[in-house]
From Swiss-Prot:
Disulfide bonds join C46-C67, C52-C79, C56-C81. One of its GO terms (cellular component) is extracellular region. GO terms for biological process: defense response to fungus; killing of cells of another organism. Residues 1-24 form the signal peptide. InterPro entries: Scorpion_toxin-like_sf. This is Defensin-like protein 37. It is found in: Secreted. Keywords: Antimicrobial, Disulfide bond, Fungicide, Plant defense, Secreted, Signal. The gene is EDA21. The keyword Lyase does not apply.
Length: 84
C-alpha cells in the first residue's frame, strides 16, 4: 500500500512539473546562451487582472508580468508572470 502511495505522489509531482500553466524560456543574449532560465506563469486573463505587472510583483514574482496572447487562435490576452 505504501509503495502505491509513493508512486501516486511521484506521478502527481511529475504532472505538476509538466503542467500547461508553466513555460520555460531562456533569458539573456539573442542566441539564448546566457544559461539563466526564466519561467513564465499564466496568472489569468488580463481583462480580470487589469494591472498585470503590479499583480505579479505583489504575489512574489519580482520580475513582474505582462499581457500576451498565448496562441494565435486565442481570443483574449493572458497575464503572464516571470520568475527565475
Amino acid at each position: 500500500m505504501a509503495v502505491k502511495l509513493i508512486y501516486l505522489f511521484l506521478f502527481l509531482y511529475i504532472a505538476l512539473l509538466i503542467s500547461g500553466r508553466t513555460m520555460s524560456t531562456t533569458a539573456g543574449r539573442r542566441d539564448g546562451k546566457s544559461g539563466r532560465t526564466e519561467w513564465l506563469y499564466v496568472a489569468g486573463e488580463c481583462a480580470k487582472l487589469p494591472r498585470c505587472n503590479k499583480y505579479c510583483v505583489s504575489n512574489g514574482f519580482h520580475l513582474g508580468g505582462f499581457c500576451e496572447k498565448l496562441s494565435p487562435q486565442a481570443s483574449y490576452l493572458s497575464c503572464v508572470c516571470k520568475y527565475t
